[in-house]
Amino acid sequence: MKDVNDEERIIGAESNEEDETIELSLRPQLLAQYIGQDKVKSEMKIYIKAAKQRDEALDHVLLYGPPGLGKTTLAFVIANEMGVHLKSTSGPAIEKAGDLVALLSELNPGDVLFIDEIHRLAKPVEEVLYSAMEDFYIDIVVGEGQTTHAVHVPLPPFTLIGATTRAGQLSAPLRDRFGIIEHMQYYSIDDLEKIIQRSSVVFNTKIDPEAAIELARRSRGTPRVANRLLKRVRDFAEVKGEEAISLATTKHSLHLLEVDDEGLDQTDRKLLRMMIENYGGGPVGIKTIAANVGEDTDTIEEVYEPYLLQKGFITRTPRGRSVTQKAYLQLGYPPKKAE
């Protein structure tokens, strides 16, 4: 069976090299410039102001939520608001405890260490963080054989900002050491429209207001998807010679890209059709779904499910996942018969 993810998804929220380049050019510098996530922003504004008044490092921050919602961007904004440097890495990149020790030893007082995908830290690496986060020291084992001994190394007060799409996979000892925990939510259409309008200025292109709204509606509540779709729709508009991206061109180009009015792409539709046609709409176990689409269960839960759940196309039950009436109607199937 062909893997549903053989081709990169235009609406996939996972980052690629082009996204990282785009996001760097669009990155706001201050909380006031950061669009959306109002609850998170208002709370962080207070925490940052209090830390600066006390002349202390900001408490450790955990940002969690689906991919593409601006966790990395917010980490950079927080560091900028605090007036400190940020050192960025990721869980998979820190392969051994010594790698983390090297990063920590380079920090100055108040600096931010940002670890993306923090749930993927190896256990020995994570354990080094415990004393570093709580008491700002690490113990380094030096020597060999009978001369082996631990050296107590103090660290300057610093802020760890961790980002994760899988908060439930964090161990309790690590999670409990974060004083600030913020849940990043999907963006509203209004906020996405503002992001699209702002991005269009950076991209040196114009977009009609109704076209921006249509693009926002199909962007899956995710700024990364909105910016990616804006770039593709801009290509269509430029080839047509439009001075500003029109609603008609937006609808036409998204139709060709197979992104429907709910933001579903062919991958979403394949997954939902598989559940409907092969399993009567469910419930279907997560392992069965993963086997049918050629992915592992983590990818299903982290990449495919969040938006489908949030939009009400599937439900999660103790017996597995079920397709909703809304999904049947969206895909053109007769209404699901009541059991």
From Swiss-Prot:
Keywords: ATP-binding, Cytoplasm, DNA damage, DNA recombination, DNA repair, DNA-binding, Hydrolase, Nucleotide-binding. One of its GO terms (molecular function) is four-way junction helicase activity. Has 3 domains, the large (RuvB-L) and small ATPase (RuvB-S) domains and the C-terminal head (RuvB-H) domain. The head domain binds DNA, while the ATPase domains jointly bind ATP, ADP or are empty depending on the state of the subunit in the translocation cycle. During a single DNA translocation step the structure of each domain remains the same, but their relative positions change. Its main location: cytoplasm. Belongs to the RuvB family. It is found in: Cytoplasm. GO terms for cellular component: cytoplasm; Holliday junction resolvase complex. The lineage of its organism: Bacteria, Bacillati, Bacillota, Bacilli, Lactobacillales. GO terms for biological process: DNA recombination; DNA repair. ATP binds at L26, R27, G68, K71, T72, T73, E134, D135, F136, R177, Y187, R224. Homohexamer. Forms an RuvA(8)-RuvB(12)-Holliday junction (HJ) complex. HJ DNA is sandwiched between 2 RuvA tetramers; dsDNA enters through RuvA and exits via RuvB. An RuvB hexamer assembles on each DNA strand where it exits the tetramer. Each RuvB hexamer is contacted by two RuvA subunits (via domain III) on 2 adjacent RuvB subunits; this complex drives branch migration. In the full resolvosome a probable DNA-RuvA(4)-RuvB(12)-RuvC(2) complex forms which resolves the HJ. It comes from Lactobacillus gasseri (strain ATCC 33323 / DSM 20243 / BCRC 14619 / CIP 102991 / JCM 1131 / KCTC 3163 / NCIMB 11718 / NCTC 13722 / AM63). Residues 188-258 are annotated as: Small ATPAse domain (RuvB-S). It is an enzyme of class 3 (hydrolase). DNA binds at R316, R321. This is Holliday junction branch migration complex subunit RuvB.
